[in-house]
Regions:
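Cleavable N-terminal export/targeting peptides
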Residues: 1-53, 280-293
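Transmembrane beta-barrel domains of Gram-negative outer membranes and organellar outer membranes
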Residues: 44-293
Length: 293
């Protein structure tokens, strides 16, 4: 029943999306949606995470996790950053993302408003938008490339000089591939729609990550992030950092990013803490394979 509903939603989204003006990024997304819809024929829910699996977060890299949180679990991810751009220094927090597993392979997430404090120009400080989303793990079978589809929208609740005007929907596809000896690759393709923006109606974001597990609890990563607006030049930066699991349900992390061109921040330094609470509410969970290792 869940796969039928998900496939129907994706099919309708693809149909509506195809009616919009097309860019190269939108062509790629339409193709991805059709592949996702086709995959519902054979996709099974028995490989998605359970409470026996360790916490996997969307931090500290820009690339989000390709897997969902377990059914009935609530995951809270937080962080604080310090950044510099064009002579201004900004401190932002708490960058809180709430992730709830509402069914096998399906989660509901919300990015809560984050406060951006401009150290040199306090009048340019304020809150970002609240952004709810649905995330569906498409390829849950262990041993293969993990892939998820996310559809969300940033609602116009933030401060005018921090958040853009109007609602901003987005469609996102994070993926990951575990290699041998603790190495892994991951990435993400996102299309942001900005119908109220007079200069650029859309931004395509691509990321690519190389990760290495250095101990049973710690791992390091290097990440490329590129934002490509429909009009104007891109913003590109290199991000690196690591994470440490205090327990199966708790994580500490850090990251350091350096801008690669003048459109990106000069630097970003941040730290974070995430925690998962299991079996908080009832959610449907299908039989599954043994937990991942």
């Amino acid at each position: 029943m869940l796969d039928d509903k998900s496939g129907s939603i994706i099919a309708r989204t693809a149909s509506a999306f195809a009616c919009a003006p097309l860019t190269v990024g939108k062509h790629a997304i339409i193709l991805a949606i059709l592949l996702v819809y086709h995959s519902t024929i054979s996709a099974k829910a028995d490989g998605c995470p359970s409470i026996k699996d360790e916490i996997i977060t969307d931090r500290p890299d820009v690339t989000n996790s390709s897997v969902v949180v377990p059914p009935g679990s609530l995951q809270i991810e937080n962080g604080v950053n310090s950044s510099a751009r064009d002579g201004d220094r900004v401190i932002d927090g708490t960058n809180t993302r709430l992730r709830a597993g509402i069914a096998s392979c399906l989660e509901f997430l919300v990015d809560t408003p984050t406060y951006f404090a401009n150290v040199r120009s306090p009048q340019n400080s304020g809150f970002s938008d609240v952004a709810p989303a649905l995330k569906w793990q498409i390829s849950p079978v262990p041993g293969k490339i993990d892939l998820s589809a996310v559809f969300g929208v940033a609602l116009p609740t933030g401060t005018a000089n921090i958040a853009s005007a109007g609602a901003q929907p987005y469609l996102q596809f994070p993926w990951s591939w575990e290699l041998r000896h603790g190495w892994g690759l991951s990435g993400m393709f996102t299309e942001f729609f900005r119908p109220s923006d007079p200069t650029s109606k859309g931004i395509t974001e691509t990321t690519f990550v190389i990760e290495k597990k250095v101990t049973e609890r710690a791992s390091l990563f290097v990440e490329y992030v590129g934002d490509y607006p429909e009009s104007g030049s891109p913003a590109q930066f290199l991000n690196s950092g690591g994470l440490y699991r205090l327990s199966p349900n708790q994580q500490l992390d850090f990251h350091v990013a350096l801008g690669l061109n003048h459109n990106a921040p000069s630097y970003v330094v941040g730290v974070g803490y995430s925690v998962r609470f299991d079996e908080l509410f009832s959610a449907n969970e299908a039989p599954r394979y043994p937990p991942r290792k």
